[in-house]
A protein has these predicted regions:
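N-terminal periplasmic accessory domains that precede
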Residues: 84-87, 106-109, 121, 136-142, ...
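Extracytoplasmic beta-strand/coil segments of soluble accessory domains associated
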Residues: 85, 89-126
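Short acidic/polar hinge/loop motifs at secondary-structure boundaries
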Residues: 126-155
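Periplasmic-side early beta-strands and strand-to-turn transitions of outer-membrane beta-barrels
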Residues: 172, 181, 207-293
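Membrane-embedded beta-barrel scaffold of Gram-negative outer-membrane proteins
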Residues: 311-329, 451-456, 480-537, 542-546, ...
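Gram-negative outer-membrane beta-barrel transporters
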Residues: 360, 365, 402-405, 506-511, ...
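Surface-exposed extracellular loop regions of Gram-negative outer-membrane beta-barrel proteins
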Residues: 415-418, 425, 430-431, 439-486, ...
Length: 677
């Protein structure tokens, strides 16, 4: 892999530019054409069709028993969200694992089930990585390309959907769409940060007749040399993170055609490329690491939806994904002086389904998916493996007044193949039921109360790494099976036009059988196997309030809390919390939208965690809290709208680790200038 050229460390000139931009941002002078806060302060730079959450949409979701958490484009801007990981951390029940830095691996686990049980969709279709089994969220950090981020933890409101989208939890990423009411829209932005990062981006959308299309891209360079502290007994050593430079390029585009009748065709394509240095885990007395990683991924998908009759609806989609990963680690201990691991994956995916609603009280749907995945590598094993998966889902929904009952039965057939027939992974077949109950006990213009309950079973197939990786994988590994149940309530109250309150609470429980884990076979060799059961129980809650104290002023406040107990449920096991899962997670936010300078504050707090099942002082990760602040302001100059933002991350400079020996950055400053027309 070509070595990334050196990049100068930001100097006094850059810091001076930051200070100047910050001063302009905070200056309370009304520019020509300045809009009031309820227009300039609250309307996002991009006006997106179908993004605003209407009362009817929320009521429909609550009526079906769905537990949905959502951030649209407006909320992403007003809350000071700078990355997808930041957005997900504002949802209750989530925990993001971050290996540090802008290019570090980032995954999300819901209710402690693990990233492998979380489905991530982009543009309505599921993403996948058959080698690792988890989606790297850092590849989708371009918030400017997202119109909406949603989290579903019970069931989806739509009865007809691709079967792969029916997971233990679903994170839905909806890309930017052409704006409503405008023929064209363009947005350009430049972002810089105190760790030596710079990121220009560009998005354009246009509408012409029945067609609308959009295209965009983002480039990121980050030096990544942030400071951290190494503790060695009573001694401490201050260092800067080395070998953490990265470059990443994201390109995306799409088109939508709406027929005069009720058909809609959607096309979407996306490409992602990066080259990065891997800093590795922190070690005492050593600060050098020469690992490199280069990744490429492209995807193209097509979706078509049409109402064949007033009672019959058709949905079809197809998708192809190609990805390539190249890892190098120079070292005299390797044959030839370098360790090279190259992986290439292909996935072809197709889905089709019919939805039938003969009466207002009854609805049924059937969908089927076919997935074929292949992986090749330069290693002795897992060098030519493939898997074909056939999914089915039969669903029905019964509605009687304010009560809704949804039932699903999903079936899965797994067929594995390998160049060496003797080493093929086990085939599998499963039937898994779902049941969701929703009741809108109160629904008025001023108040609402919705109750829900659910039970569902899902399972996770072992990844290619768990089946085939040299001296680690085992072809005999069985899929994990998860059983989940929960009860929830959502209450909404709007006593006046100036005040709105929302309260949501859910109690959940889950049990995973045939847990896939690794056990030592010899001193230096580990092997993947099924062992034991895992139990997850807990509670999540969210409270939010919106206050309009005066004209052109709006106050937003909210808080979330998650309590989860994740332990090994085997009879002979210890009841201790499993690794990397905090028992308590809390967040709080405040925002003030006003005519002068908008303000957003975010606080995240996590209890102690452990890096292994043994709870000792050497495996303990200390509890921590992280405070962030954002200041931003908009100016309107005829058809041009400018936005300047200043963001302070980890304002208190807290030292913490999410993954053992991978320190996170302390104080960071980000400045962003955006122009839209």
């Amino acid at each position: 892999m070509t070595r990334i050229p050196p990049h100068p460390t930001p100097g006094a000139g850059r810091l001076g530019g930051m200070a100047l931009l910050l001063a302009i941002t905070l200056r309370p002078v009304v520019a020509a054409g300045q809009l009031p806060a309820d227009s300039a302060g609250t309307v996002p730079l991009r006006r997106l069709s179908g993004v605003e959450v209407s009362a009817s949409r929320v009521a429909a979701e609550e009526a079906t028993g769905s537990a949905v958490q959502r951030l649209d484009a407006r909320a992403l801007q007003e809350r000071g969200v700078v990355s997808l990981a930041d957005a997900l951390q504002q949802f209750s029940g989530t925990y993001v694992r971050d290996y540090g830095g802008s290019g570090g691996l980032k995954t999300v686990s819901i209710h402690g089930l693990g990233a492998g049980h979380t489905v991530v969709t982009y543009g309505g279709l599921g993403l996948s990585d058959h080698r690792s089994g988890q989606v790297d969220l850092s590849r989708y950090n371009d918030i400017g390309d997202l119109a909406e981020v949603c989290l579903y933890t019970t069931d989806r409101p739509a009865l007809l959907c691709p079967v792969r989208n029916l997971g233990a939890a679903v994170v839905s990423l909806n890309p930017l769409r052409p704006p409503s009411g405008k023929e064209r829209f363009t947005q350009a932005a430049i972002e810089t940060g105190s760790t030596g990062s710079i990121s220009p981006s560009f998005h354009h959308a246009r509408r012409s007749g029945a067609w609308s299309w959009n295209a965009g891209g983002r480039y990121l360079f980050n030096q990544g040399h942030y400071a951290y502290v190494v503790h060695n007994g009573v001694a401490t050593e201050r260092r800067h993170r080395r070998n953490s430079r990265m470059q990443a390029l994201t390109l995306s585009g799409g088109a939508v055609r709406r027929d005069k009748g009720s058909g809609q065709l959607e096309l979407l394509a996306r490409a992602y490329l990066n080259r990065q240095e891997l800093p590795g885990a922190v070690r005492l007395y050593l600060d050098n690491n020469d690992e490199r990683m280069a990744e490429r991924e492209t995807l193209a998908q097509l979706r078509y939806r049409r109402a064949l009759t007033p009672a019959l609806r058709l949905e079809t989609a197809a998708k192809y994904t190609w990805s390539d990963s190249r890892y190098t680690d120079p070292g005299a201990e390797y044959p030839g002086g370098c360790l090279r691991q190259n992986y290439r994956q292909h996935e072809a995916y197709a889905t089709a389904g019919l939805g039938w609603r003969p009466a207002g009280w009854f609805e049924a749907a059937y969908a089927t998916d076919v997935i074929h995945a292949r992986m090749t590598s330069n290693l002795e094993t897992d060098n030519n493996v493939w898997r074909t998966t056939w999914l089915h889902a039969l669903s029905a929904r019964f509605t009687a007044g304010a009560v809704s009952l949804t039932a699903r039965l999903t079936g899965t057939l797994l067929y594995n193949g390998n160049a060496a027939a003797a080493g093929r992974a086990r085939n599998a077949r499963r039937l898994t039921p779902w049941l969701t109950l929703g009741w809108q006990a109160i629904r008025t213009d001023r108040a609402g109360l919705a109750l829900r309950a659910h039970y569902k079973e899902t399972f996770r197939a072992p990844t290619f790494t768990e089946c085939y990786y040299y001296h680690y994988g085992s072809p005999q590994v069985r899929p994990e099976r998860a059983r989940q149940a929960g009860l929830g309530v959502t209450a909404r109250l709007q006593p006046s036009a100036r005040l709105a309150l929302t309260l949501r609470a859910d109690a959940f429980g889950a049990r995973i059988t045939d847990r896939i884990t690794s056990v030592p076979v010899t001193l230096n060799i580990w092997r993947t196997t099924n062992i034991g059961r895992v139990s997850s129980t807990g509670l999540e809650a969210e409270a939010a309030a919106t206050v309009r104290p005066a004209r052109n002023h709006r106050l937003e406040a909210g808080a979330t809390y998650t309590l989860q107990r994740l332990r090994n449920a085997t009879a002979t096991s210890s009841p201790l919390q499993l690794p990397y899962t905090p028992r308590h997670v809390a967040s709080a936010r405040m925002g003030w939208i006003n005519p002068w300078c908008n303000v957003a504050l975010n606080l995240m707090a996590f209890s102690e965690r452990w890096s292994s099942p043994e709870h000792t002082s050497g495996t303990r990760l200390c509890p921590y809290a992280e405070l962030g602040a954002t200041l931003w302001r908009q100016w309107a100059l005829r058809s041009l709208r400018l936005t300047a933002r200043a963001e302070a991350v980890n304002l208190a400079g807290t030292e913490y680790e999410i993954i053992k020996n991978y320190p996170m950055p302390r104080q960071q400053l980000r400045l962003t200038l955006t122009a839209a027309w």
